[in-house]
Amino acid sequence: MHVTLPDGKQLDLQPGATALDAAKAIGPRLAQDALGATANGELTDLMTPLSDGASITLITKKNPGDAAPLFRHSLGHVMSQAVGEYYKAKGYGPDAIKRGVGPYIENGWYQDFDLPEPLKEEDLPEIEKIMRDIIGRGLDITRREISKDEALAQFPHDPYKAELIEGLPDDEPITFYSQGDYTDLCRGPHFPSTGKLPQSFKLMSTSGAYWRGNEKNPILQRIYGVAFATQKELDEYLFQLEEAKRRDHRKLGKELELFTIDPLVGKGLPLWLPNGTVLREELTNFMKEQQFQRGYQGVVTPNIGNLDLYRTSGHYPYYSESQFNPIQVDEEEYMLKPMNCPHHVRIYASKPRSYRDLPVRLAEFGTVYRYEQSGELNGLTRVRGFTQDDAHIFCRPDQLKREFLDVLDLTVLVLKTFGMTDVRFRVGVRDPESDKYVGDEQNWALAERQIIEAVEEVGLPYTIEPGDAAFYGPKLDFVVKDVLGREWQLGTIQVDYNLPERFDISYTGEDGQEHRPIMIHRAPFGSIERFTGILIEHYAGDFPLWLAPRQVMIIPIADRHNAYAEELREELHRAGLRAEVDDSSNRMQAKVRDAELHKIPVMLIVGDKEQEAREVSVRERTGEGTKERKGVKFDELKAELLERRKNRS
């Protein structure tokens, strides 16, 4: 047999040869350094036979990214072995521990166990210690193939492994991997030796998991681990995890009293508290200003609609699994609104339209309802009731590019306003091999070309994604990277040829004939709830002045300064700034600490000197820390704060 190397050269090998045999044929140094391989683009290990004619690339420590799935998988086996040794030291025999599945996942692995006594989080460091000892033993990892009957004989007391084996085909060999006295059923691939595994790993947590994900099955104990090629990468990952916890919008939402989710109200139905409502209104006011300047007309539609409306639009029954069930009212059926677009189409259709009337831009902060599985709900970012900054533009073909550019400009402005500058675009176009799309070829080609031209004019990076278009038109997704390096899809601009056709809407053209308008869907925020959740984490609750629910805290040093503090608060309040006075009996330092805990951006401290000169001492939270200024004239500070609010800075 032969295999082909990356440079095109061919190696002649014995039948049944492995990637290790290929490495040895090239040279002893490579055989020593090799950790795994890819064969025809698929990850494999050094122990698995190669197919004749395979194109292979050997993996060494020089390309740790390629090696990561291998060492994470093998560390999962090392952990499983360590758990066995841990319970053996407690006096349990090998049959007392039963193992479920244990795959490698992004950044690490997990393994499910049925244990004789539960493992606690505080036990994980001891398991880690045993793992490091197993790595230090330098055990060879070997692979063997056996029959189904032989495989079943390996696990006479483990019903989970027996069930997995019973589900495998009778006529195919079953693979086992071993290291020392530990053996497990596994497809692989794995590292060649425990001694080559990195020490940069950590066991993170334990949780319960139903066997095979079925709640009718027993609950097993799942242990999660993470691993990276270097300690530096592990440290960076752990830091990011801690930072993510610090920024978690669910935690900050409670601490800053922004929102709550009450089980009596219902899962996935957030209640906006006064502070959160201020934040929400700042977002909506910002968007309303932009929409007014760009010629949008505001509309309001009901939260339910006749089921026939959604039948006509196609949202029912095609998306019924993500919608709440219809309700019977008299002789008609109604449904909680899953989308705003059908309602906006009916507003467009409420009177005759001429080519001179177009474009028609209809905008609404419309609340919609989707049925999300309870396990998928997450604070504000995954909910069942949410409000979209939804707008629909009805335009002529010759207006499409201009309208698309304007929406693109608006969305980029929104992201820049909130400090989200690491943005890339995804242009979703048709799959040339598919016939699922509605609309004619000429219109599709025009829309795709004009979207790409619009993106190029803006000058931001983009990728073209064939097959990513909806069946009713091409689209543009905005993907934003936050301060933690996580990517979020924020907002979509979608061209739609389907709804105008389904609702048979038209405009009278210059030629006196009826023509079909093109419809554009756009929502720069996506949803107010999700965008707010992302903003909370992006800013870690330290909102800029204009966005902060509580903008100014005035702190009198003593009770005799309370009247002056209240006078300043009233002036700021009349000017439109959200100001409060902390007239509690706490010491000044405690008042400052409380204001900082609540992430109030500006603190004004007033005492005898400030009162006499109508001044304030300013303590301001910034992205770089705390900035202090003493003896600031109050009127000058008020003007400065108003200017910052006006400029949304």
Curated annotation (Swiss-Prot):
It comes from the Bacteria. Keywords: Aminoacyl-tRNA synthetase, ATP-binding, Cytoplasm, Ligase, Metal-binding, Nucleotide-binding, Protein biosynthesis, RNA-binding, tRNA-binding, Zinc. Its EC number is 6.1.1.3. Its cofactor is Zn(2+). It catalyses: tRNA(Thr) + L-threonine + ATP = L-threonyl-tRNA(Thr) + AMP + diphosphate + H(+). The keyword RNA-binding applies. The keyword Phosphoprotein does not apply. InterPro entries: aa-tRNA-synt_IIb, aa-tRNA-synth_II, aa-tRNA-synth_II/BPL/LPL, Anticodon-bd, Anticodon-bd_dom_sf, Beta-grasp_dom_sf, TGS, TGS-like. Zn(2+) binds at C341, H392, H521. GO terms for biological process: threonyl-tRNA aminoacylation. Catalyzes the attachment of threonine to tRNA(Thr) in a two-step reaction: L-threonine is first activated by ATP to form Thr-AMP and then transferred to the acceptor end of tRNA(Thr). Also edits incorrectly charged L-seryl-tRNA(Thr). Homodimer. This is Threonine--tRNA ligase. The lineage of its organism: Bacteria, Thermotogati, Deinococcota, Deinococci, Deinococcales. The gene is thrS.
